[in-house]
C-alpha cells in the first residue's frame, strides 16, 4: 500500500495551479513511495475554491486557512497565497505538526523569515520553498558542471530577469491579480519577486554573496487600487540593479525590471570561470550553453580549432530529471519544474535528506534581498551576513 501524502493547498491563483498540476502528475512520472492526495483547496472566496476544486480534483474546499492548518486529514500545507500571508500560515501549520511548503519569496522580510525557520525547525516538520527554476534541467545541469569543477576559479556572475507587464500607467495595484504591485502585500517589487529567483540560482551555483550595492527605481509612483478604486502611492521597486561580491571573490551584476519592453519572462545568467563558462536563458529553457577552455579530467586545453560554445540540448536520459519523461530530443515545460521540485521534496522525506532550498536555505535569499533593499535606501554597500 503506498503511503498517502494528504495535501491542503492555500491559494487558487497562478501558483495554486502550478502546484496542483504537480500533485496530480507526481505519481505518473516519479516512482516515489507516497501517493499525493489532493485533499483540500482553500480560498476566502468559496465559489472560486469550488470551481478550482472541480477543475483540479480536490476532495473538499475550505475558506478559512486557520481551519485547514489544524485539520486532522492533512499532512502537508502548501502556501500559494500572496507573500503577506506566508508567515502566519507557515507558523500555524508547523505548530500543528504539518509539513510546510511555500511559494517564493519565503517572507515579506528577514525578520519574518527567521521566525518561520525557527517554527519549522522547532516542530521538526519537513519544509521547502518553491524556487522552481533550480529544477529546470538545464539549470540543474549547470550546477552539475560547476560541482564537477569544470568552471574553475569563478570570476563573474551575471544575472538578468526582465518582464514588461507593468509599463502602462493605468495598470492598477492590489487585489487578486495585481497584489505583486502593492507594497503591503508583496513586501517589495522586482527584488522579492524576480531577483529572488536570480539570487537563489546564484547562491546555488556560485556560493554565498557577501555584500551588495543597489539602485532601485519606481517609474510610476501612483496607481489606482484594484479593489478600493483609490489612487495610492506605489511602494514597490519597479526595477532594481545591484552589484555583488561573492564570498569566493567573484563579482556579480544583477538586473531586474518589469519595464523591459518585449521581455515577458527573460530570466538569464552567465557564470565565467578560469576553465569555462555556462550560460542559460529561460526563453530557450531546453538549452544550456557551456564553454570549455580547459578539460578538468584530462587537464588538456580544448584544441584551438574546436574551441567554442557548446549548446547542449538537455533532453537525454542522462540529463537531470529527463529519465522520468519522454525520449531523447523531446522537451519538458515550465510546469515540470514544479513537478520536479515536488518529487525532490517527497524523495527528501523518504530518504531523510531534505530537498533544498528548505526554509533555512531560502532565508539566505531573503537576507540578500533585504541587503539589496537596504542598500538602495542608503546608497551604501551592505553586508548580507551570509
Ligand atoms: C511574476 O510575473 C512571476 O509570475 C513570478 O512571480 C514568478 O515567480 C515567475 O516565475 C514568473 O513571473
Identify the residue ranges that each predicted region occupies:
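N-terminal Rossmann-like dinucleotide-binding module
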Residues: 1-56
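Short acidic low-complexity segments
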Residues: 31, 60-72
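Glycine- and charged-residue-rich phosphate/anionic-cofactor binding loop of Rossmann-like
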Residues: 35-39, 347-364
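Hydrophobic residues in well-ordered beta-strands that form the structural core
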Residues: 62, 102, 108, 127-129, ...
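Beta-strand-loop-alpha-helix segment that lines the small-molecule cofactor/substrate pocket
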Residues: 76-134, 149
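Predominantly a Rossmann-like dinucleotide-binding segment in NAD(P)-dependent oxidoreductases
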Residues: 133-234, 288, 379
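Glycine-rich, aromatic-lined ligand/substrate-binding cores of catalytic
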Residues: 193, 201-211, 216-224, 230-286
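C-terminal glycine/acidic-rich active-site capping loop/insertion
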Residues: 224-233, 241, 245-246, 269-270, ...
Amino acid at each position: 500500500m503506498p503511503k498517502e501524502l494528504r495535501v491542503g493547498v492555500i491559494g487558487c491563483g497562478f501558483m495554486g495551479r502550478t502546484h496542483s498540476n504537480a500533485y496530480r502528475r507526481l505519481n505518473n512520472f516519479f516512482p516515489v513511495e507516497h501517493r499525493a492526495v489532493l485533499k483540500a483547496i482553500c480560498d476566502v472566496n468559496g465559489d472560486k475554491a469550488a470551481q478550482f476544486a472541480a477543475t483540479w480534483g480536490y476532495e473538499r474546499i475550505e475558506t478559512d486557512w486557520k481551519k485547514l492548518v489544524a485539520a486532522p486529514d492533512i499532512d502537508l500545507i502548501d502556501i500559494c497565497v500572496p507573500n503577506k500571508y506566508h508567515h502566519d500560515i507557515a507558523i500555524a501549520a508547523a505548530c500543528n505538526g504539518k509539513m510546510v511548503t511555500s511559494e517564493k519569496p519565503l517572507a515579506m522580510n528577514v525578520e519574518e523569515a527567521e521566525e518561520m525557520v525557527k517554527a519549522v525547525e522547532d516542530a521538526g516538520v519537513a519544509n521547502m520553498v518553491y524556487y522552481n527554476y533550480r529544477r529546470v534541467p538545464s539549470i540543474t545541469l549547470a550546477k552539475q558542471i560547476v560541482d564537477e569543477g569544470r568552471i574553475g576559479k569563478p570570476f563573474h556572475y551575471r544575472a538578468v530577469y526582465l518582464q514588461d507587464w507593468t509599463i502602462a500607467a493605468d495598470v492598477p495595484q492590489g487585489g487578486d491579480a495585481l497584489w505583486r504591485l502593492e507594497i503591503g502585500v508583496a513586501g517589495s517589487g522586482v527584488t522579492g519577486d524576480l531577483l529572488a529567483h536570480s539570487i537563489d540560482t546564484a547562491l546555488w551555483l556560485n556560493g554565498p554573496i557577501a555584500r551588495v550595492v543597489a539602485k532601485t527605481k519606481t517609474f510610476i509612483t501612483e496607481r489606482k487600487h484594484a479593489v478600493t478604486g483609490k489612487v495610492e502611492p506605489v511602494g514597490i521597486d519597479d526595477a532594481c540593479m545591484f552589484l555583488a561580491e561573492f564570498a569566493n571573490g567573484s563579482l556579480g551584476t544583477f538586473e531586474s525590471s518589469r519595464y523591459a519592453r518585449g521581455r515577458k519572462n527573460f530570466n538569464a545568467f552567465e557564470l565565467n570561470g578560469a576553465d569555462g563558462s555556462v550560460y542559460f536563458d529561460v526563453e530557450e529553457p531546453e538549452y544550456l550553453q557551456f564553454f570549455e577552455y580547459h578539460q578538468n579530467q584530462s587537464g588538456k586545453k580544448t584544441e584551438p580549432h574546436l574551441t567554442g560554445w557548446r549548446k547542449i540540448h538537455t533532453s537525454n536520459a542522462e540529463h537531470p530529471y529527463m529519465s522520468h519523461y519522454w525520449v531523447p530530443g523531446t522537451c519538458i515545460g515550465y510546469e515540470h519544474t514544479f513537478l520536479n521540485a515536488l518529487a525532490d521534496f517527497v524523495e527528501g522525506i523518504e530518504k531523510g535528506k531534505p530537498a533544498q532550498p528548505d526554509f533555512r536555505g531560502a532565508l539566505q535569499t531573503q537576507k540578500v534581498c533585504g541587503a539589496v533593499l537596504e542598500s538602495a535606501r542608503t546608497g551604501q554597500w551592505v553586508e548580507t551576513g551570509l
